[in-house]
Amino acid sequence: MWKLPVVFIIENNNYAMGTSVKRTTNVEDMSEIGKSYHMPSFVVDGMSVESVHEAIEEASARARKGEGPTLLDIRTYRYKGHSMSDPAKYRSKEEVESYKDQDPIEQVKKMVLTKKILKQDDIDTIEEDFLIKYFLKQIIII
């Protein structure tokens, strides 16, 4: 891959559409793909905002310094099906609930409340503003 200043990100949510990654490839550790190109490759806890931020910062710094590409296998979870027509019946309720307990957005909310960085009213306002902007974009796109 020469010394291209690229950060390759695999958003690994455990499923390829409706099929478990374990059933679609013999390479469970996607970071091995980058290693086969002699590229620094790392598994990242995608359920941790801090871990994702740190990994992207380091990979970006490598790219900026001309040290070449990096591959990040960011392990996260998709709560819903692949599309509107996918009811996600291939997963158990227990599996989904176990990941919801680790939800990165909820973890950040807890942290900012615990450290008194924000109050619940602030979080509610941020969420409301986001939803308004999100739905306005959807209306404009249509």
Task: Pin down the residues of each PLM region.
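Glycine-rich ThDP/TPP pyrophosphate-binding loop and its adjacent helix/strand module
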Residues: 1-140
